[in-house]
Amino acid sequence: MKHFYQDIQGWFDFQDLYKEMVKKHDNAKFVEVGAWKGKSTCFLAVEILNQKKKIKLDAIDSYEYLTDEFSYNKDAPDVFKKNIKPFKFIKPIFKNSLKAAKLYKNKSIDFIFFDSEHSEEYAMKEIKAWYPKVKIGGYMGGHDYVCFVHPDPKYVIGVGKAVNKIFDNNFKLYPGKTDKNGNLYGPSWLHKKRKESIIG
């Protein structure tokens, strides 16, 4: 199937990380937190199809933020549902991330990726809420280890501070990319859960 994520509004530069995760897994459960209009979700879904993998994908977004600076995009949930329609293996979940975590059994997820709120406090809560849900040998990652484009300093370094505190140096960084407008995206991070991991 030809990729069409380029035609969807949004921010997305972690293609390499997603390709790597699909390549590593089969008969697996993936979760994406922060879907917006489905740009990254649809890229991941096409990769799953093209690599002929049996992977179920849950896409989680509360769309609570549409009441503030994103209010002009109130159609985001409907656009998202339309964009994922070709993929029978995607399950949309319209819940807050911390509430959605309660829907999953411990050690049931092979890979989870966050692109949600970027404050240190929220990132800490989110990682701790979801970490028990990840299988031993599974992966947890997220976008914007540093969020260069955010005007509020607490969101620029919030995710990175949380990841450093929880995982120390036990994670890998994927460099961010520059978009066509010259905006540099922050790097993404990826941690592999092992028995000796700090939390879980």
Enumerate the predicted regions with their spans.
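S-adenosylmethionine/decaboxylated-SAM
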Residues: 2-200
